């Protein structure tokens, strides 16, 4: 590949990155062409295809405009993934090392009101109905701020002494910790020791009305 072509390819990658950060969604092929001075949409498609093969972007075949810059793409551009991107670290499940950023399955545009938290944020997908009374449903994604302590009443992600990650409301009581579900049919978890991984500060629900 010529240096000119490679430079144009990186211009395409940077425009995709900048548009997603600015608007929260990727540009159209025509918008990419206009931004990097390419009149041929087939040429733009060619650059997009090569960027995907390099692992710099990923496309969702079920969504026509779903283009995301990958961690490798961020590195190629020399930009940080924060504060504009939150790593999505999978599901709250037993025994998983969910706080390793290299385990990120995706990246999510950070809401403007949470930008001050910067790289201290991550997202997890909730499995189960233990928090339905406060509107956290099965399949929701929660935005979590990394912290190792919590105040009574905080909604947290914690690692229990059975090495299971869970989302509950936190209470420090006389001689134990109580992890309280927000579901009237479920009992609290009582623990002698608990490891706080972070405090839930936001929620995202992917809803499609047809």
From Swiss-Prot:
Active site as annotated: 130, 168
Swiss-Prot/TrEMBL keywords: Autocatalytic cleavage, DNA damage, DNA repair, DNA replication, DNA-binding, Hydrolase, Repressor, SOS response, Transcription, Transcription regulation
Record's catalysed reaction(s): Hydrolysis of Ala-|-Gly bond in repressor LexA
GO MF term list: DNA binding; serine-type endopeptidase activity
Gene Ontology biological-process entries: DNA repair; DNA replication; negative regulation of DNA-templated transcription; proteolysis; SOS response
Coiled coil: none
Highest taxon of the lineage: Bacteria
SUPFAM superfamilies hit by this protein: LexA/Signal peptidase (SSF51306), Winged helix' DNA-binding domain (SSF46785)
Annotated positions for site Cleavage: 94-95
Pfam families recorded: LexA_DNA_bind, Peptidase_S24
EC number: 3.4.21.88
DNA-binding span(s): 29-49
InterPro entries cross-referenced by the UniProt entry: ArsR-like_HTH, LexA, LexA-like, LexA/Signal_pep-like_sf, LexA_DNA-bd_dom, LexA_repressor, Peptidase_S24_LexA, Peptidase_S24_S26A/B/C
Main EC class the enzyme belongs to: hydrolase
Quaternary structure note: Homodimer.
Family: Belongs to the peptidase S24 family.
Role description: Represses a number of genes involved in the response to DNA damage (SOS response), including recA and lexA. In the presence of single-stranded DNA, RecA interacts with LexA causing an autocatalytic cleavage which disrupts the DNA-binding part of LexA, leading to derepression of the SOS regulon and eventually DNA repair.
Name the record gives this protein: LexA repressor
Gene encoding the protein: lexA
């Amino acid at each position: 590949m010529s240096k000119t072509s490679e430079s144009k390819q990186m211009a395409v990658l940077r425009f995709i990155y900048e548009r997603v950060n600015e608007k929260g969604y990727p540009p159209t092929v025509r918008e990419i062409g206009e931004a990097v001075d390419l009149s041929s949409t087939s040429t733009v498609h060619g650059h997009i295809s090569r960027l995907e093969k390099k692992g710099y972007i990923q496309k969702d075949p079920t969504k026509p405009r779903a283009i995301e810059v990958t961690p490798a793409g961020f590195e190629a551009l020399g930009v940080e993934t924060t504060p504009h991107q939150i790593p999505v670290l999978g599901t709250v499940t037993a025994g998983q090392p969910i706080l390793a950023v290299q385990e990120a399955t995706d990246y999510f545009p950070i809401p403007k009101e949470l930008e001050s938290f910067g790289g201290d944020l991550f997202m997890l997908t909730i499995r189960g109905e233990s928090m339905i009374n406060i509107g956290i449903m099965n399949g929701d994604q929660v935005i979590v701020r990394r912290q190792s302590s919590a105040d009574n009443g905080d909604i947290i992600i914690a690692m229990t002494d059975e090495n299971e990650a869970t989302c509950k409301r936190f209470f420090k009581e006389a001689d134990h910790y109580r992890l309280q579900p927000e579901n009237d049919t479920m009992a609290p978890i009582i623990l002698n020791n608990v490891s706080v991984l972070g405090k839930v500060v936001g929620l995202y629900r992917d809803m499609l009305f047809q």
